[in-house]
Amino acid sequence: MTRVALAFSGGLDTTVCVSLLKEEYGYDEVIGVTVDVGQPATEFEEAQATADAHGIDLHVVDATAEFVDLCFDSVRANATYQGYPLGTALARPIIAESIVSVAKAENCDALAHGCTGKGNDQLRFEAVWRNSDLTVIAPIRELELTREWEQEYAAEHNLPVQAGNDGVWSIDTNLWSRSIEGGKLEDPNYTPPEDVYEWTADPATTTETELITIGFESGYPVSINDNAHDPVELVETLNEVAGEHGVGRTDMMEDRMLGLKVRENYEHPAATTLLNAHKALEGLVLTKDERDFKRHIDSEWAQKGYEGLVDHPLMDALEGFIDATQQRVTGTVTIKFEGGQARPVGRESAAAAYSADAASFNTSSIGEITQQDATGIAKYHGYQGRIANAATETDTK
């Protein structure tokens, strides 16, 4: 008996895939796998209902803790891609690994997903899956199916498809972000209606302000207002608190890996808050040279994270540098929520690379260094440029 493990949500794509894997690919049994990375409970209920109607076994894997751990690694790397905090991208390798584990435990011959041939997720899933000895199947891509064809196929075969949000938008939710795309949003000039947002209040209507303090240890968020939280609880709390102030909305034209531009809307209140706080603490603790060089490292980490290549050998090297810098990133940051913003307004650390006395306008010297000692440096500063400019002026006369 041949058996295939399908990444299963209960939506149109994966529901159609169940039938296609049997009819077109000849598999005897399809096993559905749904991985919990912080989706709403209704999504699991819908997946189970669809699986039951299809008569297939559904395995639900809780990978929430592993996912948030990876998100916290991304905080240490200040990781965003074109301005958004990588929630969807980071979830995919976690989901893919979980599906491989189930497939091996259930003696499956193959792995399957319902991704199209136009998106990023096919690449992220398969980057993980092709490390296994299992066959990889992508029915939607391989059979070149369209959404319209799938809808007709489901209707003709009376397939159980959960309505979800009635197909108005394509929505993907996890603890780190909520993405909204498709439908009228495919028009770059279309203004999203306020009801597409669920996590964040309208920033234009939020009038209250609130201060919170976030604690970090070695670059990892560990507390809110001096109360320790486990990673999952900390993110859940900040999503609620920051979301009430309208924090964490992104409306962007995203450049996908295949070269396509796509209109995306994201909500990510906790991610925005933690990234802003972490950058503020690094600004207090790290030297200028460390901060300048780390920007390059962070950018590479974010790119690999966006591509779903979190196990790439380069990531080990990047993590080595990041880990070395983060040993001193311990302290607290005060964040002010106001008008859709999460703004750092205070930071404190025993490892601060900062001297209030040295920076003060009320002191004339720094130890043995006086203000007059800067005169020689000031004379040399820009000297090469002045010579070059003078030579250019001479040549043009």
UniProtKB/Swiss-Prot annotation:
Phylogenetic classification of the source organism: Archaea, Methanobacteriati, Methanobacteriota, Stenosarchaea group, Halobacteria
Protein name (Swiss-Prot/TrEMBL): Argininosuccinate synthase
Keywords: Amino-acid biosynthesis, Arginine biosynthesis, ATP-binding, Cytoplasm, Ligase, Nucleotide-binding
GO cellular component: cytoplasm
UniProt source species: Haloquadratum walsbyi (strain DSM 16790 / HBSQ001)
Entry GO MF terms: argininosuccinate synthase activity; ATP binding
NCBIfam families: argG, PRK00509.1, PRK13820.1
Similarity remark: Belongs to the argininosuccinate synthase family. Type 1 subfamily.
Subcellular location: Cytoplasm
Chief location: cytoplasm
